[in-house]
């Protein structure tokens, strides 16, 4: 009886070991397959995939923010008075000029929306000209790594080309005139410190910030939702993150 029990126990142990070995083989096979898939991608493949993701993101961003209330109706990118004008804003609201302040802020946002309509070609030119270094590092980085890389590499270029458009839209909707109404009233209050921020620069950079917010949104979609990978290169490149 004891010999039978020992024999049975040995069989159970043997089966358990065999099961564990088979499980390890399956896991090992999956890991190996993952490694093989990753090694099939070249640096150029990844660059092409990142470029396409940024292109799609730019199209999405421009469409989103250039619509009416694209900036003004989106809290995450709505343009408020420059920080150095916060005291002025608070003071004027207290003495009954809230609507005037709101009108000015709305005009800044509308200027950004109108300028964004012409931003796509500028963004696509920037994407085309940027040199993507460490493509695999960007691919395997944060959810907005490609967007942040593009921002770092192209903000000065975007600012240079977008600013004249912003100046034009500011003129069309009289942003400066609305600003003058605020500052004239505020500067007439005794003991206030006069302020004169560069609104053209400010609105241009805020326009760029808003565009990049939504480029990042689309990059996140492509990274995390297979259905957002609408081409073979996007599928091949971004499926690597799924392992």
Model-derived regions: residue spans:
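Bacterial Sec-dependent N-terminal signal peptides
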Residues: 1-24
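N-terminal Sec/ER secretory leader and immediately downstream segment
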Residues: 23-105
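A cross-kingdom marker for long, charged
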Residues: 25-32, 207-243
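Metal- and O2-centered redox machinery and metal/ROS homeostasis
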Residues: 39-42, 51-54, 193, 197, ...
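Second-shell loop/turn segments in exported
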Residues: 39-51, 94-95, 104-113, 123-124, ...
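Residue-level signature of catalytic and energy-coupling elements of molecular machines
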Residues: 61, 131, 226
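Mid-length scaffold segments of soluble, non-membrane domains
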Residues: 98-169
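An amphipathic alpha-helical core segment
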Residues: 165-206, 211
């Amino acid at each position: 009886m004891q010999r039978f029990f020992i024999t049975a126990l040995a069989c159970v142990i043997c089966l358990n070991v065999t099961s564990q070995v088979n499980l390890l083989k399956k896991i090992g096979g999956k890991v190996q397959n993952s490694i093989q898939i990753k090694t099939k991608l070249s640096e150029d493949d990844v660059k092409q995939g990142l470029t396409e993701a940024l292109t799609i993101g730019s199209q999405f961003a421009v469409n989103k923010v250039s619509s009416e209330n694209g900036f003004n109706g989106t809290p995450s990118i709505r343009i408020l008075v420059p920080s150095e004008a916060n005291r002025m804003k608070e003071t004027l609201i207290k003495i009954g000029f809230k609507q005037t302040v709101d009108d000015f802020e709305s005009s800044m946002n509308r200027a950004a929306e109108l300028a964004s309509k012409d931003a796509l070609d500028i963004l696509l030119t920037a994407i085309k000209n940027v040199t993507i270094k460490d493509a695999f590092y960007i691919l395997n980085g944060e959810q907005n790594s490609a967007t942040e890389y593009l921002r770092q590499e192209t903000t000065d270029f975007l600012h240079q080309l977008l600013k004249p458009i912003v100046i034009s839209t500011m003129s069309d909707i009289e942003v400066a005139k609305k600003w003058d109404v605020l500052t004239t009233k505020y500067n007439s209050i005794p003991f206030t410190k006069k302020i004169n921020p560069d609104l053209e620069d400010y609105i241009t950079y805020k326009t760029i910030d808003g565009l990049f917010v939504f480029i990042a949104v689309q990059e996140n979609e492509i990274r995390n939702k297979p259905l957002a990978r609408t081409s073979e290169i996007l599928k091949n490149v971004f499926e690597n993150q799924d392992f």
